[in-house]
Design a protein with these regions (language model features):
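Beta-rich carbohydrate-recognition and catalytic domains
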Residues: 1-169, 174-218, 230-279, 303-353, ...
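Beta-rich accessory regions
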Residues: 10-15, 260-491
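Juxtamembrane/interface motifs at transmembrane-helix termini
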Residues: 229-230, 479
Length: 491
């Protein structure tokens, strides 16, 4: 039976979430039913639908003791809200709550959720600290029960010297023989992150297997939101480092990076060959993947970052959204990303302009809007820079500028409408092709997702611009030749 705390959350969201009209939400990005969303959790395919749970505070548009919100979809674009799945209502999690986790299917057809359970505990010096453990909940896709054995993983299961204060974000899966495996992140004895592997025969009784990878203070400090999966003949360990220093393609603060390498299942040894940044934009964190029934590896993420969560639209009834899910592949040793192909199925009216010469600034007939799938191809040329302005009017725009001499693509939302002192500009390197560049851009009211050169690089950002600012403009220093294709979306 649902607890009083869970029933209260369900009643609140049913009343207040239903009062938010579809027009107040993005067209094809998932938002919380009401209130606050951060990390997507439990991204999975179960009983014929994609399930996306999420870190959730239904009562306000800011972080507070965590619940798990819940939504399902058949196409990864249209999301149906289900009742709140988890609340901080058990002895293992009745402090800051039910933190991030994941989902898998059990042999009896039930769905197993594994999450970080957090309680506040008084330390010998009198200080209150949050203790992080891992717990489970078992259900039918709608209601979930927490067994009395929780928590199922605690500090005693970690190697000596690892912290009980930073031990979180379990990502669970089933091996071919039915074994349950889970990777978590934890703070090692050197004060930096590590990814630890545990296994279980039944999902209840777990044992430590190995440390898959250590930060060694090379990639930030503490790690978050790990994932470990095979992809196109390689093995990927994806996670979110905190407190990164800018170096190469990595930027300050929270990043999402992927180690690409090989995994020996017999010895549980992961050998990395390459590491890359997963998104060069501003708002992208807390990734999680699932395997679709057709074999695609699909990734979701929080379309936000912690540094700008206080910059909210005035009077908003919800805050936080997830990205349009992306298909992952490996090309030339790196992960490339593409919007899920389900987006193609909702393409509507097509507007096409071929081999247009751009000198100075111009706009093109029919190319405008805040909900669209836009592709801009710039041909090789002698131009000195090319700029695309999105969500534009006389006072606002967000720009993408390409410098062919440095192969640098810059996303700038300085004029998007925010009044806060947050990050507005990010740049990333794209593959040099003598000035050639292909950009696919997903627009959805308050978000922009950019896929450069068929997803070799991506850049993601939340924008704060009035919806009336729907212009799109093209500008070049010199002479650039572009082909533009835009699809309206029938959602």
């Amino acid at each position: 039976m649902p607890s009083e705390i869970l029933n209260k959350a369900r009643a609140y969201e049913a009343k207040h979430g239903a009062a938010i009209s579809p027009a107040e939400r993005p067209a094809y990005h998932m938002t919380p039913y009401v209130g606050w969303l951060n990390d997507p959790n439990g991204f999975s395919y179960y009983k014929g639908k994609y399930h996306q749970f999420y870190q959730y505070n239904p009562y306000d548009v800011r972080w507070a003791p965590m619940h798990w919100g819940h939504a399902v979809s058949t196409d990864l674009l249209h999301w149906e809200y289900l009742p709140c799945a988890l609340a901080p209502d058990s002895p293992a999690d009745n402090g800051p709550g039910c933190f991030s986790g994941s989902a898998t299917q059990m042999d009896d057809g039930k769905q197993l959720l594994m999450y970080t359970s957090v309680i506040a505990e008084k330390q010998p010096n009198g200080e209150m600290r949050d203790i992080q453990t891992q717990s489970i909940a078992i259900g039918d896709g709608l209601d979930y029960e927490k067994p009395a054995c929780n928590p199922v993983l605690t500090q005693k299961d970690l190697p000596e010297g690892f912290s009980k204060f930073d031990f979180r974000d379990p990502k669970i899966w089933r091996e071919a023989d039915g074994t349950y495996s889970v990777v978590t992140v934890c703070l090692a004895e050197d004060g930096s992150g590590a990814a630890a592997l545990f296994q279980s025969k039944d999902g209840f009784d777990w044992h430590f297997v190995t440390v898959l990878e250590r930060c060694n203070n090379q990639y930030g400090k503490m790690w978050e939101c790990p994932d470990f999966f095979p992809l196109d003949g390689k093995q990927v360990l994806m996670l979110g480092p905190m407190e990164m220093l800018p170096k190469g393609e990595f930027h300050n603060g929270h990043n999402v990076i992927a180690f690409i390498g090989n995994y020996d299942e017999a010895t549980h040894t992961f050998t990395k060959e390459n590491v890359q940044l997963m998104d060069g934009g501003i708002d992208f964190y807390a990734t999680q993947t699932t395997l679709a029934p057709d074999g695609r590896r699909i990734m979701t993420a929080w379309l936000q970052t912690w540094s700008d969560t206080e910059d909210k639209p005035k009077g908003c009834k919800w805050f936080g959204q997830t990205i349009c899910p992306r298909e992952l592949h490996i090309k030339d040793g790196r992960i490339v990303q593409a919007p899920v192909r389900e987006l193609d199925a909702v393409h509507g009216k097509r507007t096409f302009h071929e081999n247009v010469t751009v000198q100075g600034e111009t706009s093109l007939e029919g190319i405008k809007g805040r909900v669209a799938d836009l592709t801009v191809t710039v041909q090789p040329g002698e131009y000195r820079s090319f700029t695309l302005k999105l969500a534009a009017d006389a006072d606002h725009h967000t720009s993408l500028t390409y410098d062919p001499y440095t192969s640098e693509l810059t996303l700038d939302r300085s004029y998007a409408g925010s009044r806060a002192d947050i990050v507005h500009i990010r740049s990333c390197k794209v593959r040099s092709q003598n000035g050639a560049l292909k950009l696919r851009i997903l627009l959805d009211k308050n978000s922009i997702e950019v896929f450069a050169n068929d997803g070799e690089q991506t850049m993601t950002a939340w924008i704060y611009t009035p919806q009336s600012a729907d212009g799109i403009a093209f500008a070049a220093d010199g002479e650039a030749t572009v082909t533009v294709e835009q699809f309206e979306l029938n959602l």
